[in-house]
Structure formats: C-alpha cells, structure tokens
Amino acid sequence: MFAEYGVLNYWTYLVGAIFIVLVPGPNTLFVLKNSVSSGMKGGYLAACGVFIGDAVLMFLAWAGVATLIKTTPILFNIVRYLGAFYLLYLGSKILYATLKGKNSEAKSDEPQYGAIFKRALILSLTNPKAILFYVSFFVQFIDVNAPHTGISFFILATTLELVSFCYLSFLIISGAFVTQYIRTKKKLAKVGNSLIGLMFVGFAARLATLQS
C-alpha cells in the first residue's frame, strides 16, 4: 500500500505507529488530565495543541532541522532544558494546587480553554527527541530513490497523526466519563492529581538527562 508513493512496508509501519502511540508520555498524560478536569472540550483542545505541535516537528524533521539539532549540541541542549523546565513547571503547578487544596471546583466550572491549548502546544514543541525520532523512524519506511520523498513523508506523518487522534479520542472520552465519578471522590481526585504532578516532574528529570 502506497508503494507507488515511495512508502515501504506500510502495514508494518502502521503496527509500529500504534505501539509507539500507546507508549505513555507527557503529551498523553496532559490530554488525559484535561479531559478529566475540563471535560471533552478541554481534552480535545489539549489534543489539538499536541497535533499541531507534532505536525510542526514532523515538518521540521522533513526540512532537515533534525540534522541541525543532532549536530549542534548547544541547540539540542537549549530545547531540551526548555522542555524539562516546562514539564517541571506543569508538574509543580499541579502538585502545589493539589497540596494547597485550592478551589478546583470553582475553576473547573470555567476552564481556561485557551491556556490548555497553549500549554499542550508548548509541551509538544519543546521535545527535541521527538524531531530526531521522526527522522530515524520514518526513514526506515521511505524509498530514498522515489521521485518525491516529501509525499512519502507526508503519508507516514498523516498516518501517525490519525493513529494518535484515535487513541487520544479514546482517552478523552474515557476521561470525560470518569470526571463525574472523580468529582464525588475528592480524596481519589487529590491522589490522582498528585500522581500526575509527580509524573510530570519525572518526565522533566528524564528529559533533562537525555543525550543527543
């Protein structure tokens, strides 16, 4: 399938893309958190931020920016530390609000949808490993002798985005159903938010220690 467009072993790629999307990460966790705290609208706004951020990174990977980042340690480190700092900021903010026992119910009635989208977009864009991954993964399924490798790259990128959309939609819908139950169990909600905050801090530490 899509062999005429320079795509090699498309079905193998699709299976690989599914497994990759299923691996939990900060983007997935952020979408799930917002679907629980702000409903389906908040979840899909977070997902849109992730999709746009990923699309930008994929385009940059195709444009050759990945090679620049890989061969320029300073640039890689700048993006890496910015991403780690932002993850730490999000995690600390969640933990502070949870431990402080702020009036989350009042805030949940009027979610800041614009802020959700912006945070998801920044979270996606400040992951230097993602752009390097796209190149290393996609290149295995592109015929370098094809006349238009850009089309091949576009097909693979679109497939990955569609798989991600399906999975995130499942999480968003599930999170929206869980919302009503969580709101009646304040202790459970507090524990859940604390775990999410700690996971973001953990993601920050991991990103800060990554090597190019």
Curated annotation (Swiss-Prot):
Signal peptide: none annotated. The chain crosses the membrane at residues 12-32, 49-69, 71-91, 122-142, 153-173, 188-208. It is found in: Cell inner membrane. Its main location: membrane. GO terms for cellular component: plasma membrane. One of its GO terms (molecular function) is antiporter activity. It is a multi-pass membrane protein. GO terms for biological process: L-leucine transport. The keyword Transport applies. InterPro entries: LeuE-type. It catalyses: L-leucine(in) + H(+)(out) = L-leucine(out) + H(+)(in). Keywords: Amino-acid transport, Antiport, Cell inner membrane, Cell membrane, Membrane, Transmembrane, Transmembrane helix, Transport. Belongs to the Rht family. Exporter of leucine. This is Leucine efflux protein. It comes from Shigella dysenteriae serotype 1 (strain Sd197). The gene is leuE.
